[in-house]
């Protein structure tokens, strides 16, 4: 008679424990009335927007860059205007949503405003995130949930840094991973990742609130890359290696996966959309945490990030996203013959760079 292996049984116990420890309760979600978001970039603003628009809670946004906060609010205004034009919201409803989005100067104001759930959504840097979690543990009440939108960093490491600098109180049991996907208003998935220290009630509240935001929740252990990036990033990295070793052009790599595998985007186009710096950081985490050579970042990916070719957000990545310059006046064009300014750098994979 065949018996399941011990590793299979342990995985089954883990799945069952999540099912029992994470009830789908409206009561758990209703405990969250005010959300604080650290980071007003595309991810942070998207999280705040959906929390205010769909979950209907008060949202406080903070960012060390005032210009980023202004850009974030302008983006929210544009989203609301689009929803009104499409008839998804009335003007009054849009005003109500906008009224629930507020800017504060710093994390200390989260505590003053009674934040129930704080979500960190900054760059994938462990030291930066650790500083934020120490500040959250210092300024938020013991009942508040401290969540991270990290896409690869260990939640248990982040939880270990959630110690109040004033009282020494350890808040590790309040920390949970809350990985949203870009663009947050469109993508319906959230990965839920408990740290080793996370209390089951925190997981229950986080799951319930994600569902209140209209999201589908998948659960993962605190393992490098979780589910999504453990699968996605090696795929993107291998596409970079296929390009750098001359196996195929960028266009043929992307066309093969789009037309042959029915992927909506090719791996190199997707890398540009995510951000090549983000892809590289995640690959470095996977490689460092597992020690497995299959996660070693592509040399090409590393070089492109060093050259500050980050993809769409920088204007150049595997493809060129810069607007085409207008043609020069005839006199200028004639004068430029045999000289003139050097051409701007081309994306990797163009005929003059491949």
Predicted regions span which residues?
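Hydrophobic/aromatic beta-strand patches that form the interior of the parallel beta-sheet core
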Residues: 60, 102, 119, 176-178, ...
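Rossmann-like NAD(P)-binding element
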Residues: 64-70, 81-146, 153
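Rossmann-fold dinucleotide-binding core
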Residues: 145-221, 229-230
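Structural/interface elements that position substrates and couple domains in central-metabolism enzymes
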Residues: 60, 215, 232-236
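A general alpha-helix detector
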Residues: 79, 188-189, 235-242, 266, ...
């Amino acid at each position: 008679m065949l018996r399941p292996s011990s590793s299979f049984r342990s995985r089954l116990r883990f799945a069952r424990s999540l099912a029992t420890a994470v009830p789908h309760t409206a009561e758990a979600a209703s405990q969250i009335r005010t959300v604080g978001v650290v980071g007003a970039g595309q991810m942070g603003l998207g999280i705040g927007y959906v929390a205010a628009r769909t979950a209907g809670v008060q949202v406080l946004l903070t960012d060390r860059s005032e210009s980023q906060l202004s850009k974030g609010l302008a983006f929210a205004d544009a989203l609301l205007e689009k929803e009104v034009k499409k008839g998804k919201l009335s003007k009054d409803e849009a005003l109500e949503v906008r009224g629930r989005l507020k800017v504060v100067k710093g994390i200390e104001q989260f505590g003053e405003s009674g934040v129930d759930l704080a979500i960190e959504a900054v760059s994938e840097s462990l030291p930066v995130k650790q500083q934020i979690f120490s500040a959250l543990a210092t300024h938020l009440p013991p009942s508040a949930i401290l969540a991270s939108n990290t896409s690869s960093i260990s939640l248990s490491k982040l939880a270990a840094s959630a110690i109040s600098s004033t009282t020494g109180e350890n808040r590790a049991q309040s920390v949970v991973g809350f990985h949203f996907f870009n663009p947050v208003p469109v993508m319906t998935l959230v990965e839920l990742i408990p740290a080793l220290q996370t209390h089951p009630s925190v997981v229950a509240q986080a799951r319930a609130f994600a569902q209140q935001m209209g999201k589908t929740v998948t659960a993962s252990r605190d393992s490098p890359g979780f589910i999504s990036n453990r699968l996605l990033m090696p795929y993107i990295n291998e596409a970079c290696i296929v390009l750098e070793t001359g196996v195929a052009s960028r266009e043929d790599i992307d066309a093969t996966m789009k037309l042959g595998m029915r992927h909506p985007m090719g791996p190199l186009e997707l890398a540009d959309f995510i951000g090549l710096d983000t892809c590289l950081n995640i690959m470095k985490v996977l490689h460092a945490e597992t020690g497995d050579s299959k996660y070693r970042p592509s040399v090409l990916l590393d070089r492109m990030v060093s050259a500050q070719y980050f993809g769409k957000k920088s204007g150049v990545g595997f493809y060129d996203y810069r607007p085409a310059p207008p043609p020069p006046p005839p006199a200028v064009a004639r004068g430029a013959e045999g000289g003139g300014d050097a051409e701007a750098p081309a994306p990797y994979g163009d005929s003059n760079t491949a």
